[in-house]
């Protein structure tokens, strides 16, 4: 985000809040996760 600069802000430089990511799964059973640190819920 560019409002807080640490992942807790509400605006993205890419536009909409839920913009599509460019990562693709490579096969069945693949799980992708993100985490910004303890107590951040992703």
Swiss-Prot record:
Q: What is its EC number?
A: 5.2.1.8
Q: Where is the composition biased (Gly residues)?
A: 1-12
Q: Identify the main location.
A: cytoplasm
- Stretch list, region Disordered: 1-20
What's this protein's name?
A: Peptidyl-prolyl cis-trans isomerase
Q: Of which family is this protein a member?
A: Belongs to the cyclophilin-type PPIase family.
Regulation of activity is described as:
Binds cyclosporin A (CsA). CsA mediates some of its effects via an inhibitory action on PPIase. Do not bind FK506.
**Classification via InterPro entries:** Cyclophilin-like_dom_sf, Cyclophilin-type_PPIase_dom
Compartments it resides in: Cytoplasm
Q: Does the keyword Isomerase apply?
A: yes
Q: Which residues form the PPIase cyclophilin-type domain?
A: 1-42
Q: Which organism is it from?
A: Betula pendula (European white birch)
Gene Ontology MF annotations? peptidyl-prolyl cis-trans isomerase activity
What domain of life is recorded for the organism? Eukaryota
Q: What does this protein do?
A: PPIases accelerate the folding of proteins. It catalyzes the cis-trans isomerization of proline imidic peptide bonds in oligopeptides.
Asked if Isomerase is a keyword of the record, the answer is yes
Task: Offer a single GO CC term for the protein.
Answer: cytoplasm
UniProt entry keywords in alphabetical sequence: Allergen, Cytoplasm, Isomerase, Rotamase
For this protein, what reaction is catalysed? Answer: [protein]-peptidylproline (omega=180) = [protein]-peptidylproline (omega=0)
